[in-house]
């Protein structure tokens, strides 16, 4: 796959090592003056040295798209100065890894690429990325987080050799840095290791200098400019750290999981129902009711924009919904007979997906591994829940996967390929409910919140969802209509 890594510091380099070693094509971005402390093991060094070698990887500074493409052709890694990662527009990566390590999101969006990985604090899986990799040293280091965020930054560095804050070398004043020691030198506590802004910087402990900013860089007072390792192993100064490798392993795991999903699944949004319980005598369409300032149907369509790696379809007969779907690149399947029930929509959607896969030229096979059916009246459903369903399907290809709460099955439901023939025989308004019963032992439930699974079937529920009438209780009906 084509992978874009934002940042080329030591942790980003550890990530690149794992992905590059697994055969993926890597492009890295940096700022004009990288402030990488562990620069001997960081590909960011290519920005000012023109090239950098870390273990088996060679990075070369690239100025243009043509430069970058030529470097990749040689099996090397281009590093391009591009703080906003505008290169993604021509590179068109399958995966973006934000490894800037700013402890906050500096502008990455979940729709920037088919799959987006956030490294460390500042990202939320299902909001601005598809998953987050834990960066805090300890039991969960390198774990893949599919819902929620990494542990918040405490401001206290991880323990190495029994030391935490003491091992950091910080600027004593604003100004230009003048290192007085080199990476790999042994220093003692109290020794002058650098001068910043004309003021000396003293070592707070003894050990080996594992990292130090390049001479001439402009720094701010208290900025981390170096670090000392009490273990005093010189080889540690020239090799990727255990932390960087663990984080890289998490990123590789996530990327490989995504590769099993990419191009193998489809999503069908069902939006052809009349919503009679909602509309009552006035004949209003349920799907056009405003939830959080936008029509209900838009919530699901907008969330599905995070899944550009799978084909998206919507079954509807509503002209306004058709117009909005086409704007978002969602393939429209027209249902001219909604009175036939939701099963008819399921059949129409399945046939459209099958036709698309058979006629596609870039498919590994003529059929998808599975289809996720989602209704349009679950405005609280999270992107992270959809992602977890797809993840599980990629590992359990023969199982039916659905969202649920405490064992109670709900929507969305992902049906594997071996169920397609039976789905085509469905009739009426039951959808796949009876099939879920038939395949009870094959159903895997992705546990989520009760709130996510509620659909809006009455105006009373609509008012509750939009917080206009908080005194009403929403019924806990969790349909398995798909």
Where are these regions (language model features)?
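Single conserved hydrophobic/aromatic residue that forms the stacking wall/gate
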Residues: 468-482
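Phosphate-binding/catalytic loops
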Residues: 402-457
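Acidic donor-binding segment of Leloir-type glycosyltransferases
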Residues: 307-332
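Conserved beta-loop-beta/alpha segment of the NTase-like Rossmann-fold superfamily
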Residues: 339-422
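Conserved donor nucleotide-binding strand/loop of the catalytic core
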Residues: 329-341
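Well-ordered secondary-structure scaffolds
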Residues: 1-262
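N-terminal nucleotide-binding beta1-loop-alpha1 segment
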Residues: 262-280, 440
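A short, N-terminal amphipathic alpha-helix
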Residues: 294-311, 351-352
């Amino acid at each position: 796959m084509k992978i874009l890594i934002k940042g080329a510091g030591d942790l980003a380099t550890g990530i690149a090592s794992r992905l590059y070693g697994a055969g993926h094509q890597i492009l890295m971005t940096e700022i004009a003056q990288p402030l990488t402390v562990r620069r001997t093991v960081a590909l960011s060094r290519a920005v000012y040295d023109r090239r950098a070698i870390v273990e088996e990887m060679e990075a070369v500074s690239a100025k243009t798209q043509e430069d970058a493409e030529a470097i990749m052709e040689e099996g090397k890694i281009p590093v391009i100065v591009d703080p906003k990662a505008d290169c993604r527009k021509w590179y068109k990566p399958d995966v973006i890894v934000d490894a800037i390590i700013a402890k906050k999101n500096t502008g990455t969006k979940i729709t920037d690429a088919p799959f987006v990985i956030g490294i460390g604090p500042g990202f939320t899986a299902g909001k601005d990325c598809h998953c987050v990799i834990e960066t805090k040293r300890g039991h969960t280091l390198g774990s893949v987080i599919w819902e929620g965020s990494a542990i918040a930054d405490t401001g206290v560095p991880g323990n190495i050799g029994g030391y935490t804050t003491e091992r950091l070398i910080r600027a004593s004043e604003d100004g230009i840095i003048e290192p007085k020691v080199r990476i790999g030198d042994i220093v003692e506590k109290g020794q002058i290791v650098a001068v910043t802004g004309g003021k000396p910087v003293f070592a707070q402990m003894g050990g080996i200098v594992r990292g130090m900013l390049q001479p001439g860089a402009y720094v701010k007072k208290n900025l981390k400019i170096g670090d000392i390792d009490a273990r005093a192993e010189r080889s540690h100064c020239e090799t990727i750290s255990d932390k960087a490798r663990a984080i890289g392993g998490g990123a590789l795991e996530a990327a490989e999981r995504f590769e099993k999903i990419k191009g193998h699944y489809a999503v069908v949004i069902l939006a052809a129902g009349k919503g009679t319980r909602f509309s009552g005598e006035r004949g209003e369409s349920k799907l056009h009711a405003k939830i959080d300032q936008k029509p209900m149907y838009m919530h699901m369509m907008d969330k599905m924009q995070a899944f550009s790696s799978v084909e998206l379809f919507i079954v509807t007969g509503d002209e306004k919904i058709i117009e909005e779907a086409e704007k978002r690149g969602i393939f429209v399947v027209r249902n001219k007979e909604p009175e036939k029930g939701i099963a008819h929509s399921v059949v129409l959607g399945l046939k459209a997906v099958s036709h698309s896969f058979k006629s596609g030229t870039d498919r590994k096979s003529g059929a998808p591994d599975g289809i996720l059916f989602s209704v349009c009246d679950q405005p609280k459903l999270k992107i992270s829940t959809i992602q977890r369903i797809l993840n599980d399907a990629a590992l359990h290809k023969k199982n039916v996967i659905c969202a649920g709460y405490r064992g109670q099955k709900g929507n969305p439901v992902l049906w594997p390929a071996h169920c397609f023939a039976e789905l085509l025989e469905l009739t009426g308004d039951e959808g796949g409910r009876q099939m879920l019963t038939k395949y009870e032992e094959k159903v895997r439930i992705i546990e989520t919140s009760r709130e996510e699974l509620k659909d809006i079937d009455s105006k009373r529920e609509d008012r509750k969802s939009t917080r206009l009438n908080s005194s009403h209780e929403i019924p806990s009906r969790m349909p398995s209509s798909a």
